[in-house]
Amino acid sequence: MLDNIKIKLQYWLPKIWLTRLAGWGANKRAGKLTKLVIDLFVRQYHVNMQEALQPDTASYRTFNEFFVRPLRPGIRPVDPHAHRLVQPADGVLSQFGPITDGKLIQAKNHDYTLEALLAGNYMMADLFRDGLFATIYLSPRDYHRLHMPCDGVLREMIYVPGDLFSVNLLTADNVPNLFARNERVICLFDTEFGPLAQILVGATIVGSIETVWAGVVTPPREGIIKRWTYPQAGEEGAVVLAKGEEMGRFKLGSTVINLFTAGDLQFAAHLNIMSVTRMGEPFAEVRQDEQTPVVFPEGTELEENDAAQPPVAATSEPVQADGQNPAAEVSGQTGHKPDAP
C-alpha cells in the first residue's frame, strides 16, 4: 500500500519545481543553518566523512559543496592493469550484463531499448548492439563524482531532456522505461577497447549535472536535445581523459549507465547484482584466451619480472565555471530519430 502511494506521488508531484527548489537551497550560503543541515544529513545516511579531503562539516559553505566533496588522495586507488577497466563511481551495481536484441535490463521483468536510452540516435545505438551494459546507482551517502573507466577521448556529448522520476529500486521496479524517460547526459568516448558511453541520469532533486570539460550541462532545462561534437585525438581542442580521472558530478543524486561495444570485454568475475562499487576497483577486463606454455631451450637465463606497478591515485579536476569547451561544435539532432515513448 505504501509503495503504491509512493509510486503515484512520482506521477503527481511537480518534480521539476521540487528539483529547482532543492537546487536553489543546496547552493545557498546559510552559515550555521547549512552546517546543521549537513550534520543531519551525515547522521541520517551514515556518511563516512573520514574519507573526505575536508572531514569538518563546518568547512563547507553550501550543501552542494559538501555533496560533491573530494576524497583524500589515495583513498580510491585505481587498478593499474592495462587490460582492466575500473568502476566509475561509488554506489551499487543495480543491473549489468549483455545487451540482448537491443534491450537492457532495468529490473526484474522490466527492460528498455538501447535506442530509447540514446534518444533515438540509431547510429550510436549500432555501436553498442550486442555489447555490454552496467547501471550503478549512487545513494545519498556515496561520493558523487564520476570517473573514467579507462583512458578515453571525448567525441560527443548529448543532453536529453526528460522527466525527473526518483531513481531507486522501487521506481526501477514500477516505472516503465525509467532511464529512457529521465533527463540525462550521454558522453561518448573513443578508447582502446572500442567506443564507450557513460550516461549520467538525472532524477528528482538532482539540481545539476556537470562535466569537467563543459561545466554545468543542466540546468537550464529548455526541453530540446542538444548535441556537441569534439575533435579526435591529436587535434587541437581534443578532450583526453585518463583512466580514473574525474569526468563529471551530480548535484544531487543519481545513476550512471555504461555501455561497452561488443568484443573481448567481460565483467570482473566477482561482480553480482547489488554488488557495492568503489571507484577505481576492477570493473571489466579483456577476455584472456588460454595460452600454450612457452618452452625455453635448456640453459636459457631468464630475468625476473619487474615488480607489479602499484595502484595509481585517482585525479579530480575542477569543473569549468564558464560553460562548454570552446573547441566543441554544437549542432542539432544529427543521427536521431524521435524520442521513443
Curated annotation (Swiss-Prot):
Catalyzes the formation of phosphatidylethanolamine (PtdEtn) from phosphatidylserine (PtdSer). Its EC number is 4.1.1.65. One of its GO terms (biological process) is phosphatidylethanolamine biosynthetic process. This is Phosphatidylserine decarboxylase proenzyme. Its main location: membrane. It is a peripheral membrane protein. The gene is psd. Residues 287-341 are annotated as: Disordered. It comes from the Bacteria. Belongs to the phosphatidylserine decarboxylase family. PSD-B subfamily. Prokaryotic type I sub-subfamily. It comes from Pectobacterium atrosepticum (strain SCRI 1043 / ATCC BAA-672) (Erwinia carotovora subsp. atroseptica). Pfam families: PS_Dcarbxylase. The modification Pyruvic acid (Ser) is found at residue 254. Is synthesized initially as an inactive proenzyme. Formation of the active enzyme involves a self-maturation process in which the active site pyruvoyl group is generated from an internal serine residue via an autocatalytic post-translational modification. Two non-identical subunits are generated from the proenzyme in this reaction, and the pyruvate is formed at the N-terminus of the alpha chain, which is derived from the carboxyl end of the proenzyme. One of its GO terms (cellular component) is plasma membrane. The record marks 253-254 as: Cleavage (non-hydrolytic). It is an enzyme of class 4 (lyase). Pathway: Phospholipid metabolism; phosphatidylethanolamine biosynthesis; phosphatidylethanolamine from CDP-diacylglycerol: step 2/2. GO terms for molecular function: phosphatidylserine decarboxylase activity. Heterodimer of a large membrane-associated beta subunit and a small pyruvoyl-containing alpha subunit. Keywords: Cell membrane, Decarboxylase, Lipid biosynthesis, Lipid metabolism, Lyase, Membrane, Phospholipid biosynthesis, Phospholipid metabolism, Pyruvate, Zymogen. The active site is at 90 (charge relay system), 147 (charge relay system), 254 (charge relay system), 254 (schiff-base intermediate with substrate). Binds 1 pyruvoyl group covalently per subunit. It catalyses: a 1,2-diacyl-sn-glycero-3-phospho-L-serine + H(+) = a 1,2-diacyl-sn-glycero-3-phosphoethanolamine + CO2. The keyword Lyase applies.
